[in-house]
């Protein structure tokens, strides 16, 4: 891979798994970037003029000739950087496997990432309050629960969806080192990012040790700091694919 001379700017919430997903991709490709941490609520003042009205992070400012001023949505960001910086690739060489990798990425984004969010915020509002019992933290959690319609019943349904998904991911990772093909792909980094909040939930750490080992390995490959919760886990990081 040649040296990449650019300095992208990633607008993010530091705790967002979708922002983590973009950082993993940028790190794996060796693309220099900086992050600007936005304040939830106030972030819309920064984003709306850049995105034409969109309010969600991540937003990437490529700051490159011939590129859009801003790219919103983690999937669109991955498409953009894969097109602009194809090596090392985050897609299999086979076109049918490329389609499969994007299909799994979309499934993780639209279903499993949301299920993880429900389970995580249900935990943080109950048994996980001690992680950060501050008034501000609890206010943010309650606002998130209200915004996304999270309650005990919806969180229980999310647990069931998550359990089925983890079974599928486990089988795929057991069959090979990667979810699709024989190299790291957008599917792997999406799984590693969106499932990382589960490291703060003791029951998941007990029931799915293989998951957190794989998440740690992918973070090592991408040169990304491990998420909160991993400091209490015994997992290995690998920096070779």
For each predicted feature, which ranges?
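Structured catalytic/translocation cores of nucleotide/phosphate-coupled proteins
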Residues: 2-27, 31-33, 60, 162, ...
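Alpha-helix boundary/capping residues
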Residues: 81-85, 108, 193-196, 218, ...
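Short, hydrophobic secondary-structure boundary micro-motifs
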Residues: 89-93, 179-182, 207, 227
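GST-like fold's C-terminal all-alpha helical module
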Residues: 110-210
């Amino acid at each position: 891979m040649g040296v990449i001379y650019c300095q992208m700017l990633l607008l993010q919430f530091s705790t967002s798994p979708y922002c983590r997903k973009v950082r993993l991709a940028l790190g794996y490709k060796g693309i220099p970037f900086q992050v600007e941490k936005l304040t939830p609520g106030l972030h819309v003042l920064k984003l709306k003029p850049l995105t034409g009205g969109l309010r969600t992070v991540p937003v990437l400012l490529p700051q490159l000739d011939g590129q859009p001023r801003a790219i919103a949505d983690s999937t669109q960001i991955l498409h953009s950087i894969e097109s602009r910086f194809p090596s090392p690739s985050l897609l299999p060489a086979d076109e049918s496997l490329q389609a499969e990798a994007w299909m799994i990425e979309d499934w993780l984004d639209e279903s499993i990432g949301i299920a993880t969010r429900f389970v995580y915020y249900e935990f943080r509002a109950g048994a996980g309050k001690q992680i950060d019992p501050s008034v501000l933290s609890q206010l943010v959690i309650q606002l998130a629960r209200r915004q996304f319609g999270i309650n005990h019943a919806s969180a229980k349904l999310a647990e069931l969806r998550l359990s089925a998904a983890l079974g599928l991911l486990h089988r795929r990772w057991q069959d090979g080192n990667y979810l699709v093909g024989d190299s790291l792909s957008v599917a792997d980094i999406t799984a590693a990012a969106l499932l990382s909040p589960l490291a703060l939930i003791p029951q998941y750490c007990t029931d799915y040790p293989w998951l957190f080992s794989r998440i740690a390995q992918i973070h090592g490959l991408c040169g990304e700091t491990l998420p909160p919760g991993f400091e209490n886990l015994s997992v290995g990081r690998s920096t070779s694919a």
